[in-house]
UniProtKB/Swiss-Prot annotation:
Belongs to the ferredoxin--NADP reductase type 2 family. It comes from Chlorobium phaeobacteroides (strain DSM 266 / SMG 266 / 2430). Homodimer. InterPro entries: FAD/NAD-bd_sf, FAD/NAD-binding_dom, Fd--NADP_Rdtase_type_2, Ferredoxin-NADP_redctase_2. The lineage of its organism: Bacteria, Pseudomonadati, Chlorobiota, Chlorobiia, Chlorobiales. It catalyses: 2 reduced [2Fe-2S]-[ferredoxin] + NADP(+) + H(+) = 2 oxidized [2Fe-2S]-[ferredoxin] + NADPH. GO terms for molecular function: ferredoxin-NADP+ reductase activity; flavin adenine dinucleotide binding; NADP binding. HAMAP family: FENR2 (MF_01685). This is Ferredoxin--NADP reductase. The keyword Flavoprotein applies. It is an enzyme of class 1 (oxidoreductase).
């Protein structure tokens, strides 16, 4: 499977739907386009498909996607692409969308950072939370030279932590997941959180507590990092301080900072679309305040929205389905069960 090269081959030919964002929501939207006989083009700013799953934690295991009791993030991306690629969607990688124009005939013109212009009859924004950068520890200055060697903000390869004394900063899902996930490879794992309790999922928090009780992990709550000791590009110690003022040190080879990300919608924020909490307001058909422009996944807001992968996939199916009424006005939208469509395709392929 090729997920890290441009295999766009459609030239400037107009497509029914332009999907902005190649994460799980965008990839599944491409599959749904195939199911509904809609031509589509994915435009992704990164050089690979998969969004945060591929870029930040490809080896992280995910447990809350229906039908997958446990699946590596990279494996989920592969499965989603295997579904979508049967319909040969056009894919453009390494180009970020900068602006859109709605033309007199109701179609859209999309411009990217490369200066390329793409045309579509409708647009689906599936760009997640937009551009994301990891939150860093403001009290640690001038550690850029350690990043990617001794200091990390994501786990892209577990071997980076194999046989190492790892200090993890954070108390959310990612911090808890990796505190447990790195136990099989790390020499020692220490989890540090500035609050008095974890903010992560209950089950994962219990897993951490169980690991602590059996002596497999050190946990320090109400504690913050104050400084680090280094030898060249190598981390040697992390200085910690409890809220009562007690300071102490722990030996460390790796510092893994997992305190969240800062998101930025970038040019999308200037598209004169209705926003709530840095997300685009959509109606029950996943349509934004602009006719023909839809949103799905984390970038979409509606009352009761739950920001998980499963919801994004549902959003994608809804958005693609309802985009048909804009792409082909007046045409009756018919639902075809996937089992029926696939059986028909297999029969026709013989």
């Amino acid at each position: 499977m090729t997920l890290n090269k441009v295999f766009f081959s459609g030239g400037e030919e107009i497509r029914d739907l332009c999907i902005v964002g190649g994460g799980p929501t965008g990839i599944f939207a491409a599959f749904q386009c195939g199911m509904n006989n809609i031509s589509c083009r994915i435009i992704e700013s990164m050089t690979q498909l998969g969004g945060q799953l591929a870029a930040l934690y490809p080896e992280k295991h995910i447990y809350d996607v229906a039908g997958f009791p446990e699946v590596p993030a990279a494996g989920l991306v592969e499965s989603l692409w295997k579904q979508a690629e049967r319909y040969n969607p056009d894919v453009v990688l390494g180009e970020a969308v900068t602006r859109y124009s709605k033309l007199d005939d109701g179609s859209f013109e999309i411009t990217t950072t490369s200066g390329s212009v793409y045309h579509s009859r409708a647009v689906l924004l599936a760009a997640g939370l937009g551009a994301f950068t990891p939150r860093k520890l403001p009290q640690l200055n001038a550690i850029d030279h350690l990043e990617g060697h001794s200091v990390f903000y994501a786990v892209k390869n577990m071997q980076d932590f194999a046989g190492k004394k790892v200090v993890i900063i954070g108390g959310g899902d990612s911090a808890l997941d990796w505190a447990v996930g790195l136990l099989p490879v790390a020499e020692r794992v220490t989890l540090v959180h500035r609050m008095h309790e974890f903010q992560g999922h209950g089950k994962t928090a219990r897993d951490v507590e169980e690991a602590k009780e059996r002596g497999a992990i050190d946990v320090y709550l109400n504690t913050e990092v104050t400084a680090i000791d280094t030898s060249g590009e190598n981390l040697t110690k992390v200085h910690l301080c409890k809220k009562n003022g007690t300071g102490f040190q722990v030996e460390a080879d790796r510092l893994l900072v997992l305190i969240g990300f800062k998101s930025n919608l970038g040019p999308l924020a200037d598209w004169d679309l209705e926003l709530v909490d840095n997300a685009l307001v959509v109606d029950s058909h996943m349509k934004t305040s602009v006719d023909g422009l839809y949103a799905a996944g984390d970038i979409a807001f509606y009352p009761g929205k739950l920001k998980i992968i499963q919801t994004g996939l549902s959003d994608a199916a809804m958005a693609v389905r309802h985009s048909l009424t804009y792409i082909r006005p007046g045409e009756k939208v018919k639902h075809t069960f996937s089992s029926v469509k696939m059986a028909r395709e297999k029969k026709n392929a013989k």
